[in-house]
Amino acid sequence: MPIPEFIKSLRAKIGTELLHVPVATVMAYDKKGRLLLVQDKPSGLWGPPSGIIDPHELPADAAVRETWEEAGVFVELTHILGVFAGEHFSHVYENGDQLAAVSTVFAAQVIRGTPRPDGMETSDARFLTPAEINALPCSAHFKVIRKATSSVETRAYFKPASWCPEGLLSCGPEDFF
């Protein structure tokens, strides 16, 4: 999805100044235990689907929506892996816009869909094994998330997603099997 309208409106007021935004990120696994990654179109780097949480949108809904938009895969969120921020979650775009993200990272299971890039933000989308991931150029924020969540044993509460792809009447796992 292109730049959200509320970000464009803020940019018109603040220019390229640093903007702090909430982001949802999804570590989604298929039945074979492979991780869904997307290749960022501008940079060529690989990482999990993620994106800005729109005003009044639940983080869980943003996570499910972004995974659908960027990779064509519908997921069921299982738990929160962590909340991340810092230098590896900041970016300066080619036009000078500065962004610092606070990312809520969710674990998820794939319910439906075959990975496909959106063609705007992502140029590739695949399920990958750890060995395949190790051979790819990955984003700094993904490296931080991957290292920090490799041994997570506790689960945090979150309100489950209610967002559903347009045209589907119901989105529970039982509706897809």
Positions of PLM-derived features:
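Active-site-adjacent beta-strand/loop module that shapes the phosphate/pyrophosphate-binding cleft
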Residues: 85-114
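Nudix hydrolase/Nudix homology domain
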Residues: 45, 115-177
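Short connector loops at helix/strand junctions that flank enzyme active sites
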Residues: 21, 30, 41-43, 48, ...
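Conserved Nudix-box catalytic region and its N-terminal flanking loop in Nudix hydrolases
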Residues: 30-70, 163
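A short coil-to-beta-strand element that immediately follows conserved catalytic motifs
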Residues: 74-84
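A generic structural micro-feature
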Residues: 18-20, 95-102, 119-122
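Acidic, metal-coordinating catalytic segment for phosphate/diphosphate chemistry
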Residues: 1-25
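Short, well-ordered beta-strand micro-motif
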Residues: 28, 105-109, 126
